Amino acid sequence: MPPRLPLTVVAAQPPCTALDVAANVRAHADTVRRAGARLVVFPELSLTGYELDAPALDPADPRLAPLVEACADSGALALAGAPLPLEGGGRSLGVLVVDGAGARIAYRKMCLGGAEPAHFTAGTGPGVVEVDGWRLGLAVCRDMGAPEQAARTASLGIDAYVAGAVDTPDDAAVQEERARRIGRDHGVPVVVASFAGPTGGGYDRTAGRSGIWAADGTVLARCGSGPGETARAVLVA
């Protein structure tokens, strides 16, 4: 097997307008165009805000077209957070993978927390996305606090662990501790895109502080707390 090429990654925390998918897609597309990265990771529920009653977003929704176009023009792959439809009705909380070919469901959050179980159905298994030979294990927020989720994901054979999150400022240190633990336990770099700015679900303030950590816990890149910031690093095999 040929060696993996370096992978340029951006963890982004774009501005978000509650329930305005079209506006949020434009913000995502602008971020992708500016990022200069092969992989751009966005926070939990980044396309709607952390709005627990947001309608499910179908991967074929035409409002996603500007993000698909931005990925096509930039040669990027984006991981965006959204409420996702379930067959037979209901919603899960998960991740869309978007590239120049379109959008598809990549992962459904396994470990729901807070008020989420009243609104969403938990996913039943781990998810992996492959880009340029890199196998990326996926997670959403509370998943990172469940060692069994990371272990099941790592058992699929992963080269990095990638998560979107929404946290309070007081939980920023917890988020970092979890990222470092997962990296050490499974020998992979960890990327966390964390929501910045106010959103729903009682999050009048969020942590931001998106980051990228090496497998040994070294901080490779880190955002501040403000919307619109990005953290960028090059992962090497």
Regions found by a protein language model. Name each.
Residues R26-G100, P169-V188:
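Cys-nucleophile CN-hydrolase/nitrilase-fold catalytic domain and related Cys-dependent amidase chemistry
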